[in-house]
C-alpha cells in the first residue's frame, strides 16, 4: 500500500498531467473548431447528416438512465441498463429527497443506542453556499454518516443564524431601492419586513446544503430568532444579569457610522496601509486619504511657547483634553503641571506625565490625548481623571462639542477643514506618509470609529477561567482540541480576555430584556441617565413587578432598551437552545452535551470560546467534549479568496459546472477533494484540477461496477459468508488488502485524520481493486475450459464482497454515487437487505481475511509486472499492447517457487504471451531481450526481437554499473575505516558483508549482460 507521502506525490503528479492534458485538449478543440469553420465556409451546402447520425449512435443522454416518473421523495427508479459513463447530475438526482422522507436522518430521543450529536454551525440567513461551507459540510457529513453506520443514535441539528447586521443591511438596501428607510416604516413594520424577507429568501443555503448531501435531521431545524430560541436567549441574559455577569457601562466600542451601531471584534477587518492611499468610504462622494500623519502645534498657556503633536486622525483633536509627556523626558521638565490651549475653543489641556503610554524616542515625545476616541487615550484618561468629550454624532458627523465652525461636517470633510484652520492660525507643521492599520467593517467597508457609548457587557473573567480549565486542567479536563496546537491559542485568548460588549444599535435581533425606569422625581430625564434604574426581566409584566419592588411607593415610566443583542450571544447558547433549553425536553436529556463541534479555526474565540463559557455557566457542563478546527481555504496560489482578486469559488459552480471554465464535477467529487486536502496545516490551497480528477475517478468506479455486474450475471446470488483460504491467490489478496484499508480508514476517522482516511479508501479502490484485481481475475471469466467453475465462483464472490464492502467504506465520503452503485448490486438470498446504504453497517476488519504471506507474494508479483511494463514502454515505440514472451531469472528455489505459483497473475497483468520461470544458470537470454532487476533474488526479461534498441539498453546498463560502483566504493570505505572491526557491532558487520556480496553479484551480472548485448550487436551487423 502506498504511504501518505507517496500517495500525495502521485496525486500531484496526476494533477499536473491533467492540467497538461487539459491545455492540450483546449488547444485541440480550438484547432478543430477553426478547421471546421474553414471547412464549413468552403462547403456550406455539404450535408452532415451521416456524421450526425454516427455521433448520435455513440453519445448517451444521462437523463435516459433515470426514470423521470420517480415521484419526489420516493426511492429512485433506476433504469435496467446502466449508462456507459458516469454523470453527476443523473446520479445525484432524487436520492436526497428519498433519504429525507424515509427518515434515515432522524434521531430518536428514546433510542438505547449510544448518542452522537453535532450542531451545524448556523449559517447566516442571508447566506449562500461558499467553499468554506462546503468544507464544513463535507467534514461534518463524513463524520455523521460514519457514526450513523457505526451503530450510533446520530443527531445532526440544522439551524440558521438571524445575522443581525447582515440581514438588516440587506433589507435596508432593498428599502433604499424603493426610496424608503427603516425609520420611514418604524420599528414594528421594519421587523415585519425582515421576517417577510427571511421567509422568502432565507432558506437558500439550506437547499444548497441538501445539494451537498448533508444528512441533517431536518425535523429539528431551528432559527436563532424563532420562539424557542428567543426564549432561551432571554433566559440566558436574565440569569447572567442576576448573577452579576452582565452589567451596563460607558466605554469605547467599535462604531460603524454607516450602520450607526457598535460592532464586534469579529466584524472588524484590518487593512495594512504602507503609504498615502485613497480609499472609498460609504457616504463620501470622493475617496478619502489615509496613510498620512499630520503634525501641528498646541500653544502653551502663558506664552511659554508650543508643543508639537502628530496624528493620523486630525479630526479627533476637537475632542483632545490633554497633552501627555514622559515623566523622565528632560526636554519637557519645565512643562510639568502646565497647560496647553486648544486653538479653536480655548479649552485648557493639562500636560500630564505618563510613562506607560508615551515613548520619548518617538516623534516629538508629546502625545495628544482624546479619551473619547482612542483606546489607549481612554485608559490614560481614566488614570489621570481626564474629561471625556465625544465629538461625533452616531452617523459620523461633528457634533456641537466640536465647535460651531465644524458642527454638522462629516468627519473626513472636517479633517480637511481642520487642516485649513490650523494653517490659517500658523499652527500647521506638515504631513508625511505613515504606515498604519485601518479598521474597516467587514459588512460595509466603513472606517471604524472608536466611540464612547453606554453599552451592555458580559464580565468574562470567571467564566473564561472555567473555560480555560476545562481544556487545560490535568484534573478536570473536559475539552479536547484537534489539532492539539489550538489549545495554546485557547489559553492565549482566555488568559487575555476582555469583557464582551453584547449590545448593538440595530432593530433586527433579540431585543435586550432590560427596561429603564424613569422616576417622577428624577432630575435627569435622559433615557439611561441613572445606571441603577435598570431592571432586567423575562417579560414587561415581570419587569413592572421588579421595578415596583425596587422603587416602592414611587411612580415611574418603564421603557425597554431599543438595543438588540450581539448575534454571537444567541450563537453562544446554540448547542443548548437547539436541544430545547431552558426546558428539560427529551432531546435535551438525551443529546446534551453534544459530542463534537466542528468549525473553522478562525472563530475559535468569537464562537467556540463563548459557547463553552456560556454553556458551562448555564448547564454546568461543557457543550461538547471535542472541538475539531478545520483549515481555511485559499486558492491554488495560496491567496485568500476575495471578490477583488476574482478568485472566489462558488461550490455550486463546481458541482454543476461553469461553461468554458469548470467541467461538471458533482457533489461527490467536490466533497472528496476537500476531505483529501484537510492534512494541509491551517490552510488549504484548492486546485480545481484535483476536483476534476476525482470526478474522473467516479467514472472509474462506475466502470468497475459495470464490469462487475456483467461478470456476475443476472442469476448470481452472493454468499452469506466467505472462506478466503479456499479462494484463488488474487481473491485472497484483494480481501486481505481490503481488510487493511478498512482498518486504516476506521483508525484515521477515529483520529480525525480525514485526509488519511480518504487516501486509504482511494488507494484501495484505485491501485488495488481497479488497477490490479479487476485485471487479475479476467482469466476466470474467459472461454469455457480455461478455468474451473469453482474458480469462477470464487472470483465472483470476491468481486461482489469487495464491491459491496468498498462502497460502504466509501459512502460517508461520496454518498450519492455509492448509493446509486450499491442499489444495483445483487443481495444474498434469504437475507434481509437494508433499504439504503445510508443505514448499512460500516465495514469493520475481519480477522480471517488478513493474509500477510499472500500480500508479500503479491508484492513480488506487482514488482515484476511493474518492471515488465517499464521494459515494454522503454523498448516499444509502436504496438505497445502486443503480447510478448518474458521469463524470470531466480537466484534460489524459494523465489522460483513463488514466481511459478503466480505465473497466471504475472502473465495477465503484464500482458504476456508466455512467461517462463528459470533458476540462475538454467538460461541463455534470447536475442532481442532486455532485463530489469526486481530485487536481489529476481530479474525479469522481456523479449521483443530485433526491435530492441541495443544502444539504449547498453546505456542503461552502463548507468546501472556506475551506480553499483559508487555503492561498492562507499561500502568498502566504511568497512576499511580505522576501528571498524573493533567498534562496529557484529550484526551490522554481517549485514555489510551480505550487502557487498549482493553488489558484487549484481556487478558481475550486468557486466555479463553488457557483453551479451555487445555480441548481439555484432551478430545483427553480420
What spans do the regions from the language model cover?
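Short acidic-hydrophobic surface loop/beta-edge motif
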Residues: 294-301, 338-343, 439-443, 515, ...
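Glycine- and acidic
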Residues: 77-82, 121-129, 187-191, 216-223, ...
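N-terminal, positively charged nucleic-acid-binding surface of large information/translation enzymes
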Residues: 2-328, 356, 370-402, 411, ...
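Feature 926 captures the class I aminoacyl-tRNA synthetase adenylation module centered on the KMSKS loop
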Residues: 295, 496-569, 573, 617-667, ...
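Active-site-adjacent bridging/hinge elements
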Residues: 112-120, 142, 175-181, 206-213, ...
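Catalytic cores of large soluble enzymes that bind and process phosphate-bearing ligands
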Residues: 83, 87, 91, 131-135, ...
Amino acid at each position: 500500500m502506498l504511504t501518505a507521502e507517496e500517495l500525495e506525490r502521485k496525486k500531484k503528479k496526476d494533477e499536473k498531467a491533467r492540467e497538461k492534458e487539459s491545455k492540450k485538449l483546449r488547444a485541440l478543440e480550438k484547432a478543430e473548431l477553426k478547421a471546421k469553420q474553414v471547412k464549413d465556409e468552403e462547403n456550406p451546402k455539404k450535408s452532415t447528416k451521416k456524421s450526425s447520425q454516427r455521433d448520435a449512435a455513440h453519445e448517451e443522454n444521462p437523463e435516459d438512465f433515470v426514470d423521470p416518473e420517480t415521484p419526489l421523495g420516493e426511492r429512485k427508479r433506476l433504469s435496467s441498463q446502466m449508462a456507459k459513463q458516469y454523470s453527476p447530475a443523473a446520479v445525484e438526482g432524487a436520492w436526497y429527497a428519498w433519504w429525507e422522507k424515509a427518515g434515515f436522518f432522524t434521531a430518536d430521543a428514546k433510542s438505547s443506542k449510544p448518542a452522537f450529536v453535532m450542531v451545524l454551525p448556523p449559517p447566516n440567513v442571508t447566506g449562500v453556499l461558499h467553499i468554506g461551507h462546503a468544507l464544513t459540510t463535507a467534514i461534518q457529513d463524513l463524520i455523521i454518516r460514519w457514526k450513523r453506520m457505526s451503530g450510533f443514535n446520530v443527531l445532526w441539528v440544522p439551524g440558521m443564524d438571524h445575522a443581525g447586521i447582515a440581514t438588516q443591511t440587506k433589507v435596508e438596501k432593498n428599502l433604499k431601492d424603493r426610496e424608503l428607510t427603516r425609520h420611514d416604516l418604524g420599528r414594528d413594520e421594519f421587523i415585519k419586513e425582515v421576517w417577510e424577507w427571511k421567509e422568502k429568501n432565507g432558506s437558500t443555503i439550506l437547499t444548497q446544503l441538501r445539494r451537498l448531501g448533508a444528512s441533517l435531521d431536518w425535523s429539528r431545524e431551528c432559527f436563532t430568532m424563532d420562539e424557542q430560541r428567543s426564549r432561551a436567549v432571554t433566559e440566558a441574559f436574565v440569569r447572567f444579569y442576576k448573577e452579576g455577569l452582565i452589567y451596563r457601562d460607558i466605554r469605547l466600542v467599535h462604531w460603524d457610522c454607516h450602520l450607526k451601531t457598535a460592532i464586534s471584534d469579529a466584524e472588524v477587518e484590518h487593512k495594512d496601509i504602507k503609504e498615502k492611499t485613497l480609499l472609498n468610504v460609504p457616504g463620501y462622494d470622493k475617496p478619502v486619504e489615509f496613510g498620512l500623519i499630520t503634525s501641528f502645534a498646541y500653544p502653551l498657556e502663558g506664552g511659554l511657547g508650543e508643543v508639537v503633536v502628530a496624528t493620523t486622525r486630525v479630526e479627533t483633536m476637537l475632542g483632545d483634553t490633554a497633552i501627555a509627556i514622559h515623566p523622565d523626558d528632560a526636554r519637557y521638565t519645565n512643562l510639568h503641571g502646565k497647560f496647553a490651549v486648544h486653538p479653536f475653543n480655548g479649552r485648557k489641556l493639562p500636560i500630564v506625565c505618563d510613562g506607560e503610554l508615551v515613548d520619548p524616542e518617538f516623534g516629538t515625545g508629546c502625545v495628544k490625548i482624546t479619551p473619547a476616541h482612542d483606546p489607549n487615550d481612554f485608559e490614560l484618561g481614566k488614570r489621570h481623571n481626564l474629561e471625556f468629550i465625544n465629538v461625533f454624532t452616531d452617523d459620523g458627523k461633528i457634533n456641537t462639542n466640536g465647535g460651531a465652525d465644524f458642527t454638522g461636517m462629516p468627519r473626513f470633510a472636517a479633517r480637511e477643514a481642520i487642516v485649513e484652520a490650523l494653517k490659517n492660525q500658523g499652527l500647521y507643521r506638515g504631513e508625511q506618509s505613515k504606515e498604519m492599520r485601518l479598521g474597516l467593517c467587514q459588512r460595509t467597508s466603513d472606517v471604524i470609529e472608536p466611540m464612547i457609548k453606554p453599552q451592555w457587557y458580559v464580565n468574562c473573567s470567571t467564566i473564561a477561567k472555567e473555560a480555560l480549565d476545562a481544556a487545560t486542567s490535568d484534573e478536570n479536563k473536559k475539552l479536547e482540541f484537534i489539532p492539539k496546537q489550538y489549545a495554546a491559542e485557547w489559553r492565549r485568548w482566555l488568559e487575555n480576555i476582555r469583557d464582551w460588549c453584547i449590545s448593538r444599535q440595530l432593530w433586527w435581533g433579540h431585543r435586550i430584556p432590560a427596561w429603564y425606569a424613569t422616576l417622577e422625581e428624577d432630575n435627569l430625564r435622559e433615557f439611561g441617565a441613572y445606571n441603577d434604574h435598570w431592571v432586567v426581566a423575562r417579560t414587561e409584566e415581570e419587569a413592572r413587578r421588579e421595578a415596583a419592588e425596587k422603587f416602592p411607593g414611587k411612580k415611574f415610566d418603564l421603557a425597554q432598551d431599543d438595543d438588540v443583542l450581539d448575534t454571537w450571544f444567541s450563537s453562544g447558547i446554540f448547542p443548548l437552545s437547539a436541544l430545547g433549553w431552558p426546558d428539560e425536553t427529551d432531546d435535551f436529556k438525551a443529546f446534551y452535551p453534544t459530542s463534537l463541534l466542528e468549525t473553522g479555526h478562525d472563530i475559535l474565540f468569537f464562537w467556540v470560546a463563548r459557547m463553552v463559557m456560556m454553556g458551562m455557566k448555564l448547564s454546568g457542563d461543557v457543550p461538547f467534549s471535542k472541538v475539531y478546527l478545520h483549515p481555511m481555504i485559499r486558492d491554488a496560489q495560496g491567496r485568500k479568496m476575495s471578490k477583488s482578486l476574482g478568485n472566489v469559488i462558488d461550490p455550486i459552480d463546481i458541482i454543476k459546472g461553469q461553461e468554458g471554465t469548470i467541467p461538471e464535477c458533482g457533489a461527490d467529487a467536490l466533497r472528496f477533494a476537500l476531505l483529501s486536502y484537510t492534512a494541509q496545516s491551517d490552510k488549504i490551497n484548492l486546485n480545481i484540477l484535483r476536483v476534476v480528477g476525482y470526478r474522473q475517478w467516479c467514472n472509474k468506479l462506475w466502470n468497475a461496477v459495470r464490469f462487475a455486474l456483467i461478470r456476475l450475471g443476472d442469476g448470481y446470488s452472493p454468499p452469506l459468508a466467505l472462506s478466503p483460504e479456499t479462494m484463488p491467490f488474487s481473491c485472497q489478496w484483494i480481501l486481505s488488502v481490503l481488510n487493511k484499508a478498512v482498518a486504516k480508514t476506521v483508525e484515521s476517522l477515529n483520529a480525525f485524520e480525514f485526509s488519511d482516511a480518504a487516501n486509504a479508501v482511494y488507494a484501495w479502490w484505485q491501485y488495488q481493486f481497479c488497477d490490479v484485481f479487476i485485471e487479475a481475475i479476467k482469466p476466470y471469466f474467459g472461454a469455457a475450459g480455461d478455468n474451473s467453475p469453482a474458480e469462477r465462483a470464487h472470483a465472483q464472490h470476491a468481486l461482489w464482497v469487495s464491491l459491496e464492502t468498498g462502497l460502504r467504506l466509501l459512502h460517508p465520503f461520496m454518498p450519492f454515487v455509492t448509493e446509486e452503485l450499491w442499489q444495483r448490486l445483487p443481495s444474498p438470498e434469504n437475507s434481509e437487505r437494508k433499504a439504503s446504504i445510508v443505514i448499512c453497517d460500516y465495514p469493520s476488519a475481519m480477522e480471517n481475511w488478513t493474509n500477510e504471506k499472500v500480500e508479500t507474494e503479491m508484492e513480488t508479483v506487482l514488482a515484476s509486472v511493474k518492471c515488465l511494463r517499464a521494459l515494454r514502454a522503454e523498448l516499444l515505440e509502436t504496438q505497445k499492447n502486443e503480447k510478448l514472451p518474458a521469463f524470470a531469472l531466480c537466484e534460489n528455489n524459494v523465489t522460483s517457487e513463488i514466481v511459478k505459483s503466480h505465473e497466471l497473475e504475472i502473465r495477465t497483468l503484464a500482458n504476456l504471451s508466455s512467461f517462463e520461470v528459470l533458476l540462475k544458470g538454467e538460461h541463455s537470454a534470447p536475442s532481442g531481450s532486455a532485463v530489469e532487476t526486481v530485487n536481489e533474488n529476481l530479474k525479469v526479461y522481456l523479449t521483443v526481437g530485433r526491435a530492441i534498441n541495443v544502444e539504449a539498453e547498453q546505456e542503461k546498463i552502463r548507468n546501472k554499473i556506475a551506480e553499483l560502483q559508487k555503492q561498492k566504493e562507499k561500502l568498502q570505505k566504511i568497512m576499511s575505516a580505522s576501528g571498524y572491526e573493533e567498534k562496529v557491532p557484529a550484526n551490522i558487520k554481517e549485514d555489510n558483508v551480505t550487502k557487498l556480496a549482493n553488489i558484487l553479484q549484481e556487478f558481475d551480472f550486468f557486466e555479463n549482460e553488457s557483453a551479451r548485448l555487445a555480441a548481439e550487436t555484432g551478430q545483427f551487423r553480420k
